[in-house]
Amino acid sequence: MNDMTLYLIIALVPLAGSLIAGLFGNKIGRAGAHTVTILGVAVSAVLSAYVLWGFIDGSRAKSDENVYTWLTMGGLDFSVGFLVDTMTAMMMVVVTGVSLMVHIYTIGYMHDEKVGYQRFFSYISLFTFSMLMLIMSNNFIQLFFGWEAVGLVSYLLIGFYFKRPSATFANLKAFLINRVGDFGFLLGIGLVLAYFGGSLRYQDVFAYLPNVQTATIQLFPGVEWSLITVTCLLLFVGAMGKSAQFPLHVWLPDSMEGPTPISALIHAATMVTAGLFMVSRMSPIYEMSSTALSVIMVIGAITALFMGFLGVIQNDIKRVVAYSTLSQLGYMTVALGASAYSVAMFHVMTHAFFKALLFLAAGSAIIGMHHDQDMRHMGNLKKYMPITWLTMLIGNLSLIGTPFFSGFYSKDSIIEAAKYSTLPGSGFAYFAVLASVFVTAFYAFRQYFMVFHGEEKWRNLPEHHDDHHGEEHHGLGKNDNPHESPLVVTLPLILLAIPSVIIGYVAIEPMLYGDFFKDVIFVNADAHPTMHIMKEEFHGALAMVSHSLHSPVLYLAIAGVLSAWLLYVKLPHLPARIAQAFRPIYVLFENKYYLDALYFNVFAKGTRALGNFFWKVGDTAIIDNGIVNGSAKLVGAIAAQVRKAQTGFIYTYAAAMVFGVLVLIGMTFWGLFR
């Protein structure tokens, strides 16, 4: 089997499973649908691991080939091809591995779903295929198709419960916000096609870069901008939409309207990592624009800190994890801005495992609570759900960067990258990610203590407290006890907990300080020496652990955990008093900085009002009543006046003839004596 055949199988097997489950779901039944899709993703995952191992042991080389050309237009070829190197192989394993866990978990989570079971499995396999096509692409056009495909399938999955108004609003919101980002992304691709040698293949674009290094473009008359900077920023606008960076982040928390398994897949391994992967893949372009890198770093820092603040006040267990995703995506974006692309991709990998674990553990707790998602109704679940408790604890310890857990190595590396960066804005970025350490630890363990410790709060609730939480809005009765989830739910938790602990220790040496990304990621060490400094300062996992003992990061995390314990275990009455004392800030956080209100009332309603204006004034008044109907009325009015001259009396016609003759005589004399 040659390489291209292998890569085609990896990409197409999930698509085949999706089509079978989607088109023949009624014939093969629920068991047939989940069997065929799980089998497809499992084959893809095993083969992806085989590909990655080939790069690790040196038996596999980078591959960049076109599979076929599907359109030729004006000398430009639009091809489907695969670029498979170490970064691609790592992402293939992450995407298919997490997707496999989500597929297995879904059997238990969606067990009681009366309709849409086969449809859901079809969607998540299609999601996996779309992401694989995105990360394996060797050209911008295929990248864009994969980019749009994950956006489309996320729309279908977020709105899976399409009879629920909040779900249809959420998926439309996600779709429209991403269209804003995708418009910028498409403009960036257009500039690449127009100015970077007339090719959309990555290797051709990168080879042409020296020819446009000093090129400028006029966005406005008389104002020259660096062509590369404008291209980088437009491409990054696309990344801001897909990877939910401020201010295009507002769709991500609402994606919780979809079932929990898809929340894990979107937030951990697929859609939100697409933008980060794209920027890392385009590192040769971004390294030529320090301005673009500074903008990226500052936006990432804003997202990391200010989205973390919003996680502090959430009461929905899934939304806490969602805001942690936003904050962690901000961390990764800071790393990209610091030219630490390998660090960003390292955190993409570690984050995928512990974030999928956190979402699926949250889903297990939701199952135990009979689909009540409000943490204020939980408490002491540790007693009833020990596997869920332990795996959630592992996920949170990795999230906050506890030494020896996977998240520690990647998260601390990002903080160090911001510290050593010399770009404008790096000081703010370092402060933001440092402050976010405390905030992350606080909201992560606030969630942990509210759910797994303290009083069993559901026993003090009215019998019907299922007003707006959960997928089916049930909730435990006063005398009910939660039960541990079945093996099909807990097994993925256990399997995801393993890399959440060890993958950082195993991978940090080759990915950050070795040559794992050699000839894949390009860094201009003279202009952006961050990684060079880090390689001199640290020499592996144990050196980072030793360094953490002298760093404020560890102590900020400990302070965050202790603060959460104090407020939600020892003094549970205090948070309400603090919220009341700082009411304006609480209201600001509760309204999410009023960005949703701004977008809805200004942009959405403003666009609708503008549309109504053009409809009523432009279309109805001017075109319909003015030009179309008005011209008909004008002709009718003229005809009516002309008709009055048709009297039927001969003397009227004789007078008209005399008048006409006089006019002709007058014109003749005018011509003779002029």
Question: How does the language model describe each region?
Answer:
Residues R30-V43, L172-G184, K383-M392, H483-P499, ...:
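Alpha-helical transmembrane segments and their helix-start/interface "positive-inside/aromatic belt" motifs
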Residues G75, V80-L83, E509-Y555, W565-R674:
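Aromatic-capped, Gly/Pro-kinked transmembrane alpha-helices
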Residues M1-L12, I28-T35, L39, L76-V94, ...:
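Membrane-entry segments of alpha-helical transmembrane domains in multi-pass membrane proteins
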Residues V98-G146, L152-N479, Y505:
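Hydrophobic transmembrane alpha-helices and their helix-loop junctions in integral membrane proteins
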Residues A61-L76, R201-F220, S410-S421, P510-M544:
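Membrane-interfacial helical/loop segments at transmembrane boundaries in membrane proteins
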Residues A11-N26, L100, M240, A244:
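N-terminal signal-anchor/start-transfer transmembrane helix
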Residues L39-I56, G181-F196, M392-I400, P492-G514, ...:
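Hydrophobic alpha-helical membrane-insertion segments
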Residues M1-L6, F24-S122, Y195-E224, T229, ...:
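Transmembrane helix-loop-helix hairpins at membrane boundaries of multipass inner-membrane proteins
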